[in-house]
Amino acid sequence: MLSVQNLEVVYQDVILVLRGVSFEIPKGKIVSLLGSNGSGKTTVIRSITGLLDIQNGDITKGTISVDGEDITNFNPSKIVEKGIAQVLEGRRIFSELTVVENLRLGGHTNSQDIQSNIEKVLDMFPILKQRSKGEAGYLSGGEQQMLAIGRALMSDPSYLLLDEPSLGLAPKLVDQIADLIKEINEQGVTVLLVEQNANMALNVSDHGYIMETGNIVMDNPSEVLLKDEDVREFYLGLNPEGTKRKSFKDVKHYKRKKRWLS
């Protein structure tokens, strides 16, 4: 299990971004983390994978543990060794390198199995296999996202953290990515899916958490969230005709769960 407990994060020594965030990702499950821009989703992932330094961020309170071991403030390479891999928002592939070269870079912590893992990833993504010797920058957006996911899988992770994998993709490609996430999970990889596309995320995941302004404001099994009136209105755009969309801050009739310690 990957567990985040009472996490607080501050940027630039003054900006409190996460305010006591707590959630769990049971082994073998897909958990979605939903929220609008600025809610703190990406900061959560950066905290787990040790990338807060990029934005001068610090964990000031709370713990992150994987399978019972505290990994709070571990460096990124050590976290990868613990079986955690991240796919960054916006794909972030090396466009001037070939598909195979991108994959090879993802396997540097598992060098003994690089070639066999490359073959395994290319078998999973036939379109990448066809273009394995071509420069990654010439791939389509969907193909680049597949490459980014494949590169993360090169380290044989137990936990895969996906940051906005549907961003900028056409609906048909979003469906393909959703099917791919399910396939990866069926192979034994536990998944944290960070998304603004609530419909896709909740249809893929087992459990969902909703963030606003650095807090977890709601969590439930995904099938329950899909039927929740407030989730349907605010995240799925299914509000009654002619009414204004509201913030969860203004919602009074659902039960918020306080997820941080007093």
What do the predicted segments below correspond to?
Residues 2-262:
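Glycine-rich phosphate-binding loops of nucleotide-dependent enzymes
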